[in-house]
Swiss-Prot record:
Motif (Bipartite nuclear localization signal): 111-129, 147-154
A cellular-component GO term for this protein: nucleus
Primary location: nucleus
Any one biological process term the GO annotation gives: developmental process
Protein species of origin: Oryza sativa subsp. japonica
Domain notes: The QLQ domain and WRC domain may be involved in protein-protein interaction and DNA-binding, respectively.
Region (Disordered): 145-176
Superkingdom: Eukaryota
Keyword Transcription regulation among record annotations: yes
Annotated family: Belongs to the GRF family.
Name assigned to this protein: Growth-regulating factor 3
Lineage of origin: Eukaryota, Viridiplantae, Streptophyta, Embryophyta, Tracheophyta
Subcellular location, record wording: Nucleus
Keywords per UniProt: Activator, Nucleus, Transcription, Transcription regulation
Gene name in the database record: GRF3
GO molecular function: ATP binding
Length: 387
């Protein structure tokens, strides 16, 4: 008869028990443990024989980065010798990925470099780009070079009179005077007012002596309406004018001693001849000019040249007056506002030659042919401008 619990005997059971393996020891258990240990040893040997995850250079770089991290944590500035290898590594990395150096951004550059330096850089903001060659000193071609500049307004030529060739300094002053009057477009009345010369090359005074200028019989100066100096200076363009004792002269004329000497000579001669040719007004109607006719030409020529302040021009233009009305209107507008009493002249000179002579004078300055005609009216001693 079989035993009921025979299956529970370890000797009867040759199969390994999956339920309680620890309760019994099978004869094959020792062999399995040895094989398991052998497998684990083989795995460990394979793990030990495997190469390390970092190379020696990578370990060195890792140590360097750890040192930089320690500097950053401590709040101490990182030395430059620790940052140079990192910069070189970034440069080598950029050259590895971008074979052409201009195609990449590169290290420490703010913008992308131009892949085609010699080509015009005008684009539409997308893929299109101008195919023309750029100018030598510009990054754009000739067509696109001035696109961004404001060129809506062109410069306006302010000079109204065409420049003329400068005559030699040895030419007579009368020829210079006639050329200056006839070529000036702002004063046709004076240019055509010569009595005997007309539009020719003679003096503008019509009958005056060479080297002098006097008002012609058909030309008078009327300065009734006040006009600014810009009416005369508008035809001069951008010339530099300066005030002098005998009118407004260009700056270029002041630097030439020969021209200045010729002008002074012409002015002095015309000043000597001025009273005899323009003194056609009635002296009796002006008490202050009672003894003007007594002064001879030598006394007038010996008068000193008084420096005057910058003057204003009165009158808008020069007009021609009929010969019938010439006797009553000659130079009268210049003396309408003179004081009638002698007490109004407190600071007259005590000189005998100047005691009865008014300080109000009329002088006409005649520059060269390339300059503009200028007229000055002097100022009286009490500060009143004559008109």
């Amino acid at each position: 008869m079989a035993m009921p619990f025979a299956s529970l005997s370890p000797a009867a059971d040759h199969r390994p028990s999956f339920i309680f393996p620890f309760c019994r020891s099978s004869p094959l258990s020792a062999v399995g443990e040895e094989a398991q240990q052998h497998m684990m040893g083989a795995r460990w040997a394979a793990a030990v024989a495997r190469p390390p995850p970092f190379t020696a250079a990578q370990y060195e770089e890792l140590e360097q980065q750890a040192l930089i991290y320690k500097y950053l944590v401590a709040g101490v500035p990182v030395p430059a010798d620790l940052l140079l290898p990192i910069r070189r590594g970034l440069d080598s990395l950029a050259s590895r990925f971008y074979h052409h150096p201009v195609l990449g951004y590169g290290s420490y550059f703010g913008k992308k470099l131009d892949p085609e330096p010699g080509r015009c850089r005008r684009t539409d903001g997308k893929k299109w780009r101008c195919s023309k060659e750029a100018a030598p000193d510009s990054k754009y071609c000739e067509r696109h070079m001035h696109r961004g500049r404001n060129r809506s307004r062109k410069p306006v030529e302010a000079q109204l009179v065409a420049p003329h060739s400068q005559p030699p300094a040895t030419a007579p002053a009368a020829a210079v005077t006639s050329t200056a009057f006839q070529n000036h477009s702002l004063y046709p009345a004076i240019a055509n007012g010569g009595g005997a010369n007309g539009g020719g090359g003679g003096g503008g005074g019509g009958g005056s002596a060479p080297g002098s200028f006097a008002l012609g019989s058909n030309t008078q100066l009327h300065m009734d309406n006040a006009a600014s100096y810009s009416t005369v200076a508008a035809g001069a363009g951008n010339k530099d004018f300066r005030y002098s004792a005998y009118g407004v002269r260009p700056l270029a004329d002041e630097h030439s001693p020969l021209i200045t000497g010729a002008m002074d000579t012409s002015i002095d001669n015309s000043w000597c001849l001025l009273p005899s040719q323009t003194s056609t007004f009635s002296v009796s109607s002006y008490p202050m000019l009672g003894n003007l006719s007594e002064l001879d030409q030598n006394t007038i020529c010996s008068l000193p040249k008084v420096e005057r302040e910058p003057l204003s021009f009165f009158g808008s233009d020069y007009v021609t007056v009929d010969s019938g009305k010439q006797e009553n209107q000659t130079l009268r507008p210049f003396f309408d506002e003179w004081p009638k009493a002698r007490d109004s002249w407190p600071d007259l000179a005590d000189d005998n030659s100047l005691a009865t002579f008014s300080a109000t004078q009329l002088s006409i300055s005649i520059p060269m042919a390339t300059s503009d005609f200028s007229t000055t009216s002097s100022r009286s001693h009490n500060g009143i401008y004559s008109r």
